[in-house]
């Protein structure tokens, strides 16, 4: 099987990580894959903030736990030693999609490197708070940014979970011959010529 297809089919969300730190090279490769994600009109509106500082990582975990409504002490990042925050420029109309595509690329890159990852929500709520906007400024990040997601990434602790069964009935084939009748309402000279071809 093609290696890209293999990665697409085998990647899983991981919910148990080893505490071992990742190298800057590993994280750099993951982020590079994210930077090459497709973006609306080529705007490249998404950015990545790579968090390896334990104090900041734990602060984000505690805030995420509070927003999510879990009991104090629960780690929504499942022990992952590194968190990659994805934010996107609010002034770009496709910023949420751009950030989501960046996340997808990075999840696949982590898998290709033999690492585990998981998408964690609530970045929007966090970065709507003044203190987190202030944190961005501390890091030298200016502008209007919306939190898209956190990528928790690290070495997998335990077995990779089996894939969930795919739900049926999620693909519809709109094949040209079977659509002729359905598009009768729109038939004009151009459509008639198309049908005759």
Where in the sequence are the language-model features?
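Acidic, surface-exposed loops and disordered segments
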Residues: 1-197
